[in-house]
Amino acid sequence: METDIVIIGAGPIGIFTAFQAGMLDMRCHVIDVLDQAGGQCTALYSEKPIYDIPGYPVITAQKLIEQLMEQASPFEPVYHLSQKVEKISNNEGENFTIITNIGTEVKCKAVIIAAGNGMFEPNRPPLSGILEYENKSVFYSVNKISDFQDKTIVIAGGGDSAADWTVELSKVAKKIYVIHRRKEFRCTPETRNKLESLENDGKIELVVPYQLHELAGGNGQLRAVIVKNIASKEEREISADFLLPFFGLSMNLGPINNWGIELEHGRIIVDPATLRTSRDRIYAIGDIATYPDKLKLILNGFAESAMACYHIYKVIHNSPVNFQYSTSKGIHRN
């Protein structure tokens, strides 16, 4: 298989890059280790609202991915899902051969790494027998809010994810207990005010300073969560249908470490003007890329996508783009 650009990562920035490249008449293949496009937006936060997309006062992560996929579809990008890029070889001059873990090979003229935070998995709390309950009554993400309708939920964690999901799920849940080691939550003041309001209304209870201690139930169905007070060591049993631990994600760059690209603190160093890495014709955009004063916003990732694509076009064709606004150019299928 041959193409112009291989995009590594099928999150929102990677999908938009397929569209942006298509607008410049460049063909793309997109490779992602997950079994569906969307990255963390689909895998972890599908029903979480996003508020900073221009033109959308609010849009769920899943809906954003669907819209981006539709936007890119006229250019017919080829998706290789459930595959991990193992090797980037350019033994044949300027062109690359991309090789995945299942032996897929794609020849291309340039590579764009849009791998977000790299390979990730949720941090699992050290509770005996927790594996029995996972994906049955213990979940590390929320795929369908309706699954929690009229249920009693224990949410563990004190960061943005725990606080945000408490606010969202309080709209459908019977009761939510929020377990945190400290009285202070690491969330925005606005969200903290919402938590206090929900507690005053009896929709949630902030169980602090406590930590998870034990699970009670059987056959994968949770009956209760036992928590322990940090100071007094007093134990408390909370009847619950679900446990949602939000203790962050463990990130791993995986094979990226072996691609001969200059890294800094787990991120790929790029030229902020072009998004080019330390290897010619290999670019990095979105959260995986770093440069001075970078803003880790989805909007910035979209802009980086355009900058990288325009520079790739110039390199491939040895001439600058004949710039046209999308209103003039329109959309033409490959």
Swiss-Prot record:
Query: What does the cofactor field's note say?
Result: Binds 1 FAD per subunit.
EC number of this enzyme: 1.18.1.2
Q: What are the boundaries of the signal sequence? A: none
Q: Which reaction does it catalyse?
A: 2 reduced [2Fe-2S]-[ferredoxin] + NADP(+) + H(+) = 2 oxidized [2Fe-2S]-[ferredoxin] + NADPH
**Keyword annotations for this protein?**
FAD, Flavoprotein, NADP, Oxidoreductase
Q: Which InterPro entries match?
A: FAD/NAD-bd_sf (IPR036188), FAD/NAD-binding_dom (IPR023753), Fd--NADP_Rdtase_type_2 (IPR022890), Ferredoxin-NADP_redctase_2 (IPR050097)
> Does the entry feature the keyword ATP-binding, yes or no?
no
Gene Ontology MF terms: ferredoxin-NADP+ reductase activity; flavin adenine dinucleotide binding; NADP binding
Residues where FAD binds: D32, Q40, Y45, V85, F120, D287, T327
Q: Which cofactor does it need?
A: FAD
Keyword Flavoprotein attributed: yes
Domain of life the protein comes from: Bacteria
- Subunit info? Homodimer.
Family, per entry: Belongs to the ferredoxin--NADP reductase type 2 family.
User: HAMAP family, alphabetically?
Assistant: FENR2
- In Swiss-Prot or TrEMBL terms, this protein is called Ferredoxin--NADP reductase
